[in-house]
Every structure is written in C-alpha cells, then in structure tokens.
A protein has these predicted regions:
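Structured C-terminal helix/loop/strand segments within mature extracytoplasmic catalytic/sensor domains
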Residues: 5-8, 303-369
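A short, well-structured edge-of-sheet supersecondary motif
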Residues: 40-76, 316-320
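Active-site SXXK
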Residues: 64, 81-107, 134, 181-185, ...
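Active-site helix/loop module of the DD-peptidase/beta-lactamase fold
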Residues: 82, 101-139, 160, 188-232
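Bacterial peptidoglycan biogenesis and beta-lactam-recognition machinery
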Residues: 97-104, 181, 186-194, 202-210, ...
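Active-site-proximal alpha-helical segments within enzyme catalytic domains
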Residues: 177-184, 231-254, 307-324
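Active-site Gly/Thr loop motif
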Residues: 222-223, 227, 267-319
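Peripheral terminal and inter-domain segments
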Residues: 352-503
Length: 503
C-alpha cells in the first residue's frame, strides 16, 4: 500500500509544456477543461490503494492533453521504467513500419527470412508459419517457446520447435514469437529494433531517451543478428513516452499532422486477430491483435507487474501507468469502475477548485519510507564479520553501514557484484553505481534502525518495478531480503543494470 506524502514534483499546471529527458511534452490541461470530473481520478487512486496495488506513475491524456499525472517517489517524471511485455507493442510497430516500407508483408513465411537457419526436416506447421501468426501469438505452440530455445542460436532452435496446432488457429502467449519478430526486423534492416524505431517513431514523438536490453551471443553465428533486442521485453521508457505512443495509436497513427504509422496498421494491430477464450482473467480473454490485448473497453499494451498503455478510442483517452503488482486485473477493474464512467461524460465536475485539490494530491505521492530511528545502538561504521564468499544465487546482503549526510552509506553484495549506495533517513537517497564495467544501476534507498541492532533499508531499482527490503541483524551479520515483486529472470539487483553496450 502506498502513502501520499513527499516532495515529488507536482503535476504541471494547465497550458504550456514541460521537457522531461529532453523530450517535448504533451500539452497540459485540467480535467474540467477536458470534460472530466477530477473526483473520478481521486476515486481511482482511492480504489487502487484499497486494493493494495503499488503504482509508480500515472498519466491520463484526455482529448489530446494531459489532465492528470503523478509519480510515487522515488520514481520521477524523467526516469525510464522497464516495460516488460509492453515492449511487444513497440516491436510490432517496428514490423508495421517495415511493412509500410515494403520490406515484408504479414503473409510472408517466417522461414523465408532465414534460409540458412531452417532445419532440413522442418515441421510442416513451421514451414507454413507466417509473420501474422507471430504478431497475433498464433504460432500454434501450446506453450511459450522462450524457455525451449537455444540462447546461443535463437532462430534455428525456434524453427526446430514443432507447433502442436496449425498456425493461425491457436492462441498461446509466446515470448519466443516476439523474439522472432525482433530477429526479422533486424535481419531485414541491418539495425536493432530500437535503432530502427528512433528516426521513424521515437524521434518524431519527441522521445530521445530509451534503452532496450539485448540478447548476448544469441546470433548462432549469423552476423546480421549480433545486435538483437529482446523484442518481447527489455524496453525502458519514461511514462510520458508511453502516453505519447498511446496517443499516436488513438490518433490512428498521426502525430502533429504526420502519418507516422499507417492507419491500416493501427486498425489491424488494435482489433481481434485471434480469439483467446482460455485466458483466466476477463481483460485477457477479449481477443488479441498484433501484440496488443483487447480489453472490455478499448485495447492496450501491457507488461508484467502493471505496466500499461491503455487506449480508449470511444472516450478519446489514453492512460499510461507503471506499477509493481502481481494483480494487474485489479488495476483494470479500478479503471472500469471509477474512471471509465466519468470518461463517458463531458461533465467537468465541480471545477477548478477540485482540479487544484487533485493536482496537490498528485504532487505529494510516495512509496513507503523505512520506519524507525536515525541513531544506531552500535558504533558505526559497522562491518560484517565475514565478507561474502561464494555468493549464492538470488541473495543480497548488507556488508557495511557507515554514517553519511542525510543518512548512511551502505555496501551491498549480491551474487554478481559488490557496490556502495546512499541511503536516506526519512527521505530517498539516489545513487548511480557501476556494478561492473559497462553496467550501471540507478538506486534510491531509505533506511532506519528498527531496534538498536537491526537496520532496515528499502532499496528501489528505480528503472524497474523492483524494490528490495533488506533487514540486517548487525549482531549476527545476517541479512534477509524480500522483493516487492521478484524480477522475471535473475533475482539480484546488479542483473537489472543498464549495460552500456546496449545503448
């Protein structure tokens, strides 16, 4: 559950534009000016908090203008945030741009792009697999192929996995399919997906800051695939960049009078291409487009732990959210119950006073700080009696605590690296550390002594949804670690670092 007290930046007032991370911002307005009752946004925030959902940011775009925005400290407007599977919608858009440039069509056979990688005994279903089947998660495989491919020869091993069903007839959420789309774009263009998107999509949208994790050594000896973005995950963007992407699709591919993405592509990507009735949650069984989910209302790209780009054409609205929750359906339930009914009206509510109250609330959001005392019951600096040796997978520990301005300086050790971070008392202290050569991690930490020999630190990896609660028993030197939501992949903080080679 989140609390709402901090000195995080307030929402920008109406009119004017801001610039976060060098990107020209969307126009700003107020909810009443765009026909929305500010109380509906407040009810949404209340409902999410009641469901104990941890939001990190929110941006609501109504009739083309931002009418509500907020970041829960230590998250900030300019900060990049891992999108997880929301990345897929950007990969599909790269395919759409390549289709518009006549580099391929959605009816091209997947094997046609990789003649040297096709097994001699290729399965007939693989031989008939089309680009559209990858886009719509209808490759025919019953299970995600990602865990079954050879990470050193991704394309060949994917093409060696026989689908159980005829392509185009069976929906399975398949990260391997999106990885193949990334490989196709890279093979055709000679560029990784991120670099292909920069001049065609990101820069025209004013998005200058983006990072996409690559797959090391997955090319199988193919020089055209040496720089391969994950495609299915790994893209990091600021919240406003997510909102701009949604607004582009809401506007049928037009941005400031320029058709950046073909209208036909937007239409096809955002309508049902395959049914998915076996999905358990109501907003995940409304059908699937080209790497977009259909919802009970509108459509969306989304990623693990609550990264959302929700597009609602019927009410001319886009909602961008970043979060850390395993209950993504709860967020959408709150959208439908609290926000959507108000969006169906043009009633601005009680006017500017209510709007000012909402902006004040959005300006002081924070995640919970560590609670306790500033003074230790032991002499500092404190050092663990036995520094980490033979680090165990998935473990993180505090190896030293020393006093510093506004708090402490902590030495942390995980299975991959040892590094020092600042830790604030009753505030968030930010650090950027090089966890190993060429890999940098942005951290914000808050700490306190819960008793004379127990130190607790909240350590947020602020370019991701993930935060560690570290509790150090200085009497024994032991540390317990608990994630808010555990990363999908290696569960050590250093594994979440940006690798400069991927920039």
């Amino acid at each position: 559950m989140t609390n709402e007290t901090s000195d995080a930046p307030a929402a920008t007032s109406r009119g004017g534009r801001a610039s976060y991370g060098g990107a020209a911002s969307l126009p700003r307005s107020t909810p009443p000016e765009r026909g929305l009752d500010p109380a509906a946004v407040g009810r949404f925030l209340d409902a999410v908090q009641a469901r104990e959902v941890e939001l990190h940011s929110l941006m609501l775009v109504r009739h083309g203008s931002v009418v509500a925005e907020g970041w829960w400290a230590p998250y900030e407007p300019s900060g990049l945030h891992l999108l997880y599977s929301l990345s897929k919608s950007f990969t599909a858009t790269a395919v759409g741009l390549a289709v518009e440039e006549r580099r391929l069509s959605v009816d091209d056979l997947v094997t046609s792009f990789f003649p040297g990688r096709v097994p001699s005994d290729v399965h007939p279903y693989v031989a008939q697999l089309k680009v559209r089947d990858l886009l719509s998660m209808a490759s025919g495989h019953h299970e995600d192929t990602l865990e079954r491919v050879d990470r050193h020869d991704l394309v060949r091993s994917f093409l060696a996995l026989p689908p159980e069903e005829e392509p185009g007839t069976w929906f399975t959420y398949n990260n391997g399919a999106t990885l193949m789309l990334s490989a196709i774009v890279t093979k055709l263009t000679g560029e990784r997906v991120l670099d292909y998107l920069r001049p065609r999509l990101l820069e025209p949208l004013g998005i200058t800051d983006a990072y996409w994790q690559q797959i090391p050594d997955g090319d199988g000896g193919d020089p055209d695939l040496r720089h391969l973005d994950l495609g299915f995950s790994g893209l990091h963007l600021a919240t406003e960049s997510i909102a701009k992407f949604g607004q582009l699709f809401l506007s049928r591919g037009v941005w400031q009078g320029e058709q950046l993405v073909a209208e036909d592509w937007v239409r096809d990507a955002s309508r049902v291409q395959v049914d998915n009735p076996r999905e358990p949650e109501p907003d995940w069984r409304q059908g699937y487009g080209y790497q977009f989910w259909m919802g009970r209302e509108g459509y969306r790209g989304d990623g693990a732990f609550g990264q959302f780009c929700i597009v609602l054409p019927d009410v001319d609205t886009v909602l961008a959210l970043t979060s850390a929750t395993e209950n993504m359906q709860a967020i959408l339930d709150c959208v439908w119950s609290e926000l959507y009914p108000a969006l169906q009206s043009e009633d601005g509510g009680t006017g500017e006073e209510a709007s000012a109250e909402l902006q004040a609330r959005l300006g002081v959001l924070t995640l919970p700080l560590a609670t306790g005392d500033h003074n230790a019951g032991i002499e500092l600096p404190w050092l663990a009696a036995s520094p980490t040796t033979g680090r165990q997978e998935g473990t993180t520990r505090i190896e030293s605590i020393e006093e510093a301005a506004d708090g402490w300086r902590l030495t942390l050790a995980d299975e991959h690296a040892t590094y020092a971070v600042g830790c604030g008392f009753q505030t968030w202290a930010r650090s950027e550390v090089e966890v190993w050569p060429g890999a940098r991690l942005q951290v914000a930490a808050s700490g306190a002594w819960s008793d004379p020999t127990t130190f607790t630190a909240e350590v947020a990896m602020v370019q991701t949804p993930h935060r560690l609660t570290l509790t150090c028993d200085t009497a024994t030197g032991s540390t317990t670690a608990q994630w808010n939501v555990a990363p999908l992949g290696p569960t050590s903080p250093s594994a979440l670092a940006f690798r400069l080679a991927d920039d």
